[in-house]
Amino acid sequence: MIRLIKILFLFYCLATVSFFQPFDLVSAQAAKAISYSLLMGLLVATCLSSVSKRKSNERFRTPMVWLMILFGVACFIPTLCNFDQSVLQSFSVTLPFFSYALYFTMHRFSFNEDFIHKIIFALAICTIITHIINLITFPVIIFGTPQDEYDLSRGGIRLVMIGFSFVVLSFFITIDKWLRTKAPKWGIFAMACYIAIFLSYTRQHILICTFLGFLMLFNHVHWYKKVIILGLGCILVMSIFPKIPAVQNMIELTQEQNERNRGNETEDIRIQAAKFYGYEQFPSLANRLFGNGVFTFKSAWGRQMQAVTESERVYAVDVGIFGFNWSFGIFSIVCLLVVFYKAIVVRSQKYVVGRYYFIWLFVSSFASGALLYPSQIIVTVIVLYLIDTYNYKRLYLCGLKSA
């Protein structure tokens, strides 16, 4: 049974990245149908499992349970508010968010750390390889769809990187492994992940990952090495990075956007989106607390919202945490903040990788859709489980030593 659950979990992870869509053989709709079926199967298996006792190492249990309840409430909001969208339609489009419940699946069937790391590394490697192939074959898109957006204004080809969050997580894990073991393979893997992050040409991710990567190195070495790392970092930032053509283009693009925003009466597009999803579009206090629900383009309300967002050019994926707030309300945001707090701030949380990942997730969620994509949700769930596993193992070993 456990072996079958692990296979289903692996295939679900692949489905969240649409199986990398080679030559568009697996359409987005087919991948979505497969992922929905796998997710439902995993959740049903979790509910039917004979193991019902609460485990002591589920530190995120309470906020995750409340998130599931609030997601369920959100399925009824559009119908109760007469938004012209049925409960069934709302459930079908909200279902990917229930993948947060896979946190309980992983605990229920006690996934081992090696299995999880293999999934993370395999998908990160596949992401890097497929992205490089797409860059080489551009404008022909081999992995993905021809409709995927691209941008040539940043000194390189900015393409959609399927499975990006697996690369980010692998970046932090491999740095941690290299610091602990000094094995060259982990250092090489970390560099490959960083290069892939840079090739995404997404400014906030490059800046955040660069800063956090240096911080990981800085916090794990002696003081004299800290001075060396700090010096090298200053040299890179002040002298080398600005001379890289892609970096120059991204700096110039940022300056142009700032000048354009100052010259125009209209605000920055992300500030407009943050206002739209943060506090402007809530018909009542109940909607502010519980959200508006998730809309689907198959409903009249969804088509109306699509027209509004297109005309005003405000997109939830540009301001993920505000988009999450719009769909699920303040109570859900509070649950998320509790998760962030337990993963980042609480001193008993000793899993360094988890802390750095959640710092990246929290900061990037203000300017990307990091909380909204299924492929990023599943990575977040994996990290939550790894935090629990690492800290429980650490407490167990401490107990053995003191006995």
What label would you give each PLM region?
Residues 264-328:
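Long extracytoplasmic/lumenal interhelical loops at the membrane interface
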Residues 1-255, 310-401:
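Hydrophobic transmembrane helix bundles of membrane-integrated enzymes that assemble
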Residues 28-31, 239-276, 287, 299:
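Flexible juxtamembrane loops connecting transmembrane helices in multi-pass membrane enzymes
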